[in-house]
């Protein structure tokens, strides 16, 4: 018993000595025990969607992490990223938008609530330039959200300077892999959110399984703590006029909470994510709002016939909308088992592997 105790003391002394040497070499905080001041709760920035914040498990995108948003064209990827910027700015955050596609619509960003006067915007010429700008911004320690739109537009310098028909196999994937190795640690230390918007491509010759893949190789899939698959489900019409899209978002990877949760919300043209639409959908699921046929009502108050009429009512009756929203948030906060989204187990081995890594 005495020999075992002495051995444990010697092992602990050797470990303390090793930790002391590491701290001398790399500075205090380079290594520590979890009980010595590690952050237990991960800070987050809201996505602008109550349902998506809930599905992500921590109230939004995790700070100090890399996030990937991917999906087909016109599915709402940039809209979601701009909502994150708007939410960060509301709390005094500094945000940057790396517009590699050279397609940022400033007027649309303003309609989503982005303070474009304080937004840092860059339109880089090459992928290397874009990633260097990201590195400088992150290293400043003064940035809260950086959006790169998009990975597919991060064209390597060699490809731009070469001829149109030249073959450049794997250049972009190598560029991104090298950059992410550097960015991961500094993003964590700066406690900012780095969002990459990505496009979808089709793999040739796939007979079984999902033929879709994202651009830029596999590095981003591994380094991302959260990956969101965003899709347009159907058009929202006012008579014959299309006024928005019903959108589905699936959390295909989540390192900070359980993955594979799925939410639906409306993205309205010139408005973005419809807050009142979410209030109605979640209110119905939580039995806060009553739905009888096409009629919606709350506490005996008739909100309207049809969802669009109910949305119009809540837009003009702020007190009622705020009251319902507060009840939804209180119910979600008090009961972690409340489900306002679908949880789908994945039969796709590709998706399961991404969730693990």
Curated annotation (Swiss-Prot):
Keyword DNA-binding: yes
Matching PROSITE patterns: RECA_1, RECA_2, RECA_3
Keywords, in A-Z order: ATP-binding, Cytoplasm, DNA damage, DNA recombination, DNA repair, DNA-binding, Nucleotide-binding, SOS response
Chief location of this protein within or outside the cell: cytoplasm
Pfam families noted in UniProt: RecA (PF00154), RecA_C (PF21096)
One Gene Ontology CC term in the entry: cytosol
Binding site for ATP: 71-78
SMART domains: AAA
Localization terms from the record: Cytoplasm
Molecular-function GO terms, alphabetical: ATP binding; ATP hydrolysis activity; ATP-dependent DNA damage sensor activity; damaged DNA binding; single-stranded DNA binding
The family this protein is said to belong to: Belongs to the RecA family.
Its biological purpose: Can catalyze the hydrolysis of ATP in the presence of single-stranded DNA, the ATP-dependent uptake of single-stranded DNA by duplex DNA, and the ATP-dependent hybridization of homologous single-stranded DNAs. It interacts with LexA causing its activation and leading to its autocatalytic cleavage.
Protein name in the entry: Protein RecA
Native organism: Ehrlichia canis (strain Jake)
């Amino acid at each position: 018993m005495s020999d075992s105790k002495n051995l444990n003391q010697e092992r602990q002394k050797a470990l303390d000595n090793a930790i002391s040497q590491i701290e001398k070499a790399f500075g205090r905080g380079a290594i520590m025990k979890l009980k010595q001041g590690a952050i237990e709760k991960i800070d987050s920035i809201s996505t602008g969607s109550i349902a998506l914040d809930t599905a992500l498990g921590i109230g939004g995108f995790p700070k100090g992490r890399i996030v990937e948003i991917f999906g087909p064209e016109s599915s709402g990827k940039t809209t979601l990223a701009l909502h994150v910027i708007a939410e960060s700015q509301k709390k005094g955050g500094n945000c940057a938008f790396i517009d590699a596609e050279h397609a940022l619509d400033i007027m649309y960003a303003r309609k989503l609530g982005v303070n474009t006067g304080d937004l840092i915007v860059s339109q880089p010429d090459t992928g290397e330039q874009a990633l260097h700008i990201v590195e400088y911004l992150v290293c400043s320690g003064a940035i809260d959200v950086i959006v790169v739109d998009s990975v597919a537009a991060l064209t390597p310098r060699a490809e731009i300077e070469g001829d149109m028909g030249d073959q450049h196999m794997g250049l972009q994937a190598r560029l991104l892999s090298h950059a992410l190795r550097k960015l991961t640690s500094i993003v964590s230390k700066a406690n900012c959110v780095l969002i990459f918007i990505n496009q979808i491509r089709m793999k040739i010759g796939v007979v079984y399984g999902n033929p879709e893949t994202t651009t830029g190789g596999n590095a981003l899939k591994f380094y991302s703590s959260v990956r969101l698959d965003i899709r347009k489900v159907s058009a929202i019409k006012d008579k014959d006029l299309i006024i928005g899209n019903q959108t589905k978002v699936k959390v295909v990877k989540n390192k900070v909470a359980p993955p594979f949760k799925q939410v639906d919300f409306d993205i309205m043209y010139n408005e973005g994510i419809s807050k009142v639409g979410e209030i109605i959908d979640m209110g119905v699921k939580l039995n806060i709002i009553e739905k009888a046929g096409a009629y919606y009502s709350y506490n005996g108050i008739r909100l309207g016939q049809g969802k669009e009429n109910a949305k119009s009512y809540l837009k003009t009756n702020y007190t009622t909308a705020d009251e319902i929203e507060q009840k939804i948030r209180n119910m979600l906060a008090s009961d972690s088992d409340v489900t306002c989204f679908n949880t789908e187990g994945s039969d796709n081995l590709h998706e399961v592997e991404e969730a693990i890594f």
